[in-house]
Amino acid sequence: YLVDHMLVCGINYFVPHAFSPKYPDADCPPHFYARGTNSQYPLFRELMLYTKRMAHALSGGVHVADVAVYYNAEAEWSGGKYMLQQEVCCELTRNQIDFDLIPQDVLAASECREGKLVVNEESYGALVVPYSQYLPKRVTDAISRLLEEGLSVLFVDQLPDRTSELLPVGKTLERAEIVPLK
């Protein structure tokens, strides 16, 4: 079940490991063999063969996600109120909307082509920005530029009050759509 769940979520590289060959070692589980006392050990080979086969079949493809979520690593340090991006990610996942997290340096270097956010070889139809009272100026400048270039930008709950540098965010952000989390 866990392997299938991870595969469905896009994980296709697995490194199974046991932390300590000493058994029993309560501080370092799991023990795959456990001196023959692990009743599931004979099935472990089958699980690993299945995992290898599925991971191989699902690798090398082109990932398509239509939504980019701004990864606001600076939110906690900005001193204001903020929403964890996990809240937005959970809501998107519950509604089966695939997404990628985009940090500020990648967002600042991105461009908009034909109404889509283009990052490396990926393109996204919308950028979702979790609520944050303050956003770095570099981010508000990038979002303003992307809005002017025609990207659909959605701020969750409300626009930021100011930049992290305590500067006004500018009028361009007002063109973005404000949406509730749920």
Feature names for model-found ranges:
Residues 1-182:
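Carbohydrate-binding surfaces of carbohydrate-active enzymes
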